[in-house]
Amino acid sequence: MVVALKPIYDAVGIKRINVATYQAVSGTGKEAIEELASQTAKLLSGQDIVCEVYPKQIAFNVLPHIDTFQDNGYTREEMKMIWETRKIFGDPAIQVNPTCVRVPVFFGHS
């Protein structure tokens, strides 16, 4: 994101960034990939599912929950986006409003 926005920031400035990321389960690891596959197969077969990796069903669902929630309501992943943007832009005042969502895709963030 910052690679695309930095030239704009340098040319005319940016005061606020609203951004959403849609991240595949592979970002959580092998167990998450297996959980998505298992839940998908079971739901399509009319069976009950088990949630072990994620706190809620991931198959046919989206979870606005990547990493742990912080006291300010953002997740750690969202806070990393804020911190990194401010650091790279050299602007501690820039407002960044990220939403990071886990989606039921095996590989490839959107």
Where are these regions (language model features)?
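Active-site-lining helix/loop region of Rossmann-like oxidoreductase modules
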Residues: 1-110
